Amino acid sequence: MSPSKTTPPSPTALVYGATGVTGWGLCKNLLEQQADSASTPTFSRVIGVCKQPAQDLGLFLEDKRFELVDGVDLLQGEDSVVEVLKEVKGIENVTHVFYVANRNSPSDGPDERISFNVKMIQSAVKAAEQLSSNMQVLIMQTSINVYGIFASLMGGTLTCPSPLVESADRTPSPYREMDVHYAQCDELKRLSKGKSWSWFEVRPDAVIGYVPRRHENNFTVSLGLFLATYAHVHGAGAPVRFPGTPESWKCKFSMVSQDQLARFEIHLATHAEGLQSGEAFNVSNGDVLTWSKLWPEAAARFGLRGVGPEGAGEEEGKGEAEGGAKGATGWSWPLGDETTMKKWEEENQVQKGWGGNLSEVCFVNTMRPTVDRILSLDKAKKIGFEARDDTIAAFDKAWALFKKARILP
């Protein structure tokens, strides 16, 4: 189909991956966006796209400008996507596309993961081009894996010393061929060649936030469930050992809240004039963290006493011998104990099926890296983004939403 030529009264956003931790935050912040100047407009319409059924998701998004369209499988190709979206009100007015969809199934090998994710970005872009002739900007979110974080876990090194800068080279072989983000960016470069729209890459570390469904990339709820169920079994005040390593316990890193991430991506999308298409930008809350600082704070939110990992030193491990931090204290300790998890759900009147439903990927990715990975924010500052967020407060905010949804007690 050929998109109709229109002049939308104000920007319209299309969000692929709308019910993920980033996508939900994007939709919420797009709806909250206020026009404080000609270059920061209010979005007249926000169209969220997801694959899974959207009923009973507890989105907490009530705005007549918002529509969530489910049943969109990007792996089925652009024609399938167009068929689902073509009747959506305002789809022909889409000006800004936010691509935060991702397939990260544990069953996929590196080659499969790359193939699937490249196919998804192809479908998303080609469908948007067919549906709207007003497309101006596409924002694609990747991650700091482009700097070699995964490579460092497999014996490789980072592409540059911390603070990590966007101009760093790609990781060398064989890790380069295993990185899905490089393939995604190469495909977007190809798809955008000769087009009137531009695209930009956003690179966060771990994202803190609420999402209304189970998702393998949501570290926030996995950490909350880990600590909540641990407190249920071991009691208030029990010491809980950090399930990482002595090296990762002291490494410096940066996280980002879903609101901070969304605000930056919206700022970038609406301040893209004069930028080179394909540019990459780091984003974080702006504070520098270590697990030795964050773990005790997180544990305290659930009535526990956070202590260091085995071998971290006498000070970090103080109190473990008093009981409660020995034995099955790694990230996987709740898995397989269905009886205890069901009892936890019943006694706390939370949604069924969440107890013990933790993400191995999230724990490994956030608690196992042994290299400093602070992100340089110089490029973000150069385009006028000076906002900061507090990481501990971001966890508090997200966990409050999970409690409201009766996922956490």
Curated annotation (Swiss-Prot):
Pathway: Mycotoxin biosynthesis. Signal peptide: none annotated. NADP(+) binds at residues 49, 68, 195, 288, 290, 299. Transmembrane segments: none annotated. It is an enzyme of class 1 (oxidoreductase). GO terms for molecular function: oxidoreductase activity. Its EC number is 1.-.-.-. Keywords: NADP, Oxidoreductase, Virulence. Residues 306-332 are annotated as: Disordered. It comes from the Eukaryota. Pfam families: PRISE. InterPro entries: NAD(P)-bd_dom_sf (IPR036291), PRISE-like_Rossmann-fold (IPR055222). Short chain dehydrogenase; part of the gene cluster that mediates the biosynthesis of sirodesmin PL, an epipolythiodioxopiperazine (ETP) characterized by a disulfide bridged cyclic dipeptide and that acts as a phytotoxin which is involved in the blackleg didease of canola. SirD catalyzes the O-prenylation of L-tyrosine (L-Tyr) in the presence of dimethylallyl diphosphate (DMAPP) to yield 4-O-dimethylallyl-L-Tyr, and therefore represents probably the first pathway-specific enzyme in the biosynthesis of sirodesmin PL. Belongs to the short-chain dehydrogenases/reductases (SDR) family. Highly divergent. This is Short chain dehydrogenase sirS.
